[in-house]
């Protein structure tokens, strides 16, 4: 078994941006997920399009897309990436939650896991922000990477 190490630390333990100069360009994709739990009445208001702030779901999707593009600005050691695809979906779950899934794609030398995780997280934060006036008990939960493909480490799929 090969020794695992933190790639963002140099031999002296100092933070560094990983050098991907010599890595092969491959097709890469990642999908992340997060949930916002809320009062059933809040979810019904959103789904019926009756929220006073307008289309909550469209705003959250756009926020997630923007967040994926700005990940390198938010997470200090992330590379600026030329993403070729970003999809954010938001679906109701039971009577008290919205499930956000974000998928990011590119052809490049580094993965897009952080971009997908950031997109899902910020979409949930936007849902919270837009709905906090009517429901302060919301909970953002279960932020996780569902799958990734491409690159040296191959494919990962979370067991559901």
Curated annotation (Swiss-Prot):
Signal peptide (UniProt feature, chain positions): none
Claim: Lyase is one of the keywords in the record: yes
Pathway the protein contributes to: Cofactor biosynthesis; molybdopterin biosynthesis
The enzyme's E.C. designation: 4.6.1.17
Catalytic activity: (8S)-3',8-cyclo-7,8-dihydroguanosine 5'-triphosphate = cyclic pyranopterin phosphate + diphosphate
Class in the EC hierarchy, top level: lyase
Keywords: Lyase, Molybdenum cofactor biosynthesis
Keyword Isomerase: no
Pfam families: MoaC
GO terms assigned for molecular function: cyclic pyranopterin monophosphate synthase activity
Residues the record lists as binding substrate: 77-79, 114-115
Residues annotated as catalytic: 129
GO BP terms, alphabetized: Mo-molybdopterin cofactor biosynthetic process
Assembly notes: Homohexamer; trimer of dimers.
HAMAP family: MoaC_B (MF_01224_B)
Function recorded in the entry: Catalyzes the conversion of (8S)-3',8-cyclo-7,8-dihydroguanosine 5'-triphosphate to cyclic pyranopterin monophosphate (cPMP).
PANTHER family assigned: CYCLIC PYRANOPTERIN MONOPHOSPHATE SYNTHASE (PTHR22960:SF29), MOLYBDOPTERIN COFACTOR SYNTHESIS PROTEIN A (PTHR22960)
Xref: NCBIfam families: moaC (TIGR00581), PRK09364.1 (NF006870)
Name this protein carries in UniProt: Cyclic pyranopterin monophosphate synthase
Species per Swiss-Prot/TrEMBL record: Alcanivorax borkumensis (strain ATCC 700651 / DSM 11573 / NCIMB 13689 / SK2)
Gene name in the database record: moaC
């Amino acid at each position: 078994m090969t020794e695992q190490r933190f790639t963002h630390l140099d031999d002296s333990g100092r933070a560094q941006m990983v050098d991907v100069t010599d890595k092969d360009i491959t097709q890469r994709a990642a999908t992340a997920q997060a949930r916002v739990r809320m009062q059933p009445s809040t979810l019904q208001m959103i789904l019926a399009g009756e929220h006073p702030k307008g289309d909550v779901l469209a705003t959250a999707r756009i926020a997630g897309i923007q967040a994926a593009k700005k990940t390198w600005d938010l997470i200090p050691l992330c590379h600026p990436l030329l993403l070729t695809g970003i999809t954010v979906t938001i679906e109701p779950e039971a009577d008290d939650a919205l499930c956000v899934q974000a998928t990011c794609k590119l052809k490049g030398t580094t993965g897009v896991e952080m971009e997908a995780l950031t997109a899902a997280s910020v979409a949930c934060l936007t849902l919270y922000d837009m709905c906090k006036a009517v429901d302060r008990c919301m909970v953002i939960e279960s932020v996780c990477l569902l799958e990734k493909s491409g690159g040296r480490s191959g494919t990962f799929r979370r067991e559901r």
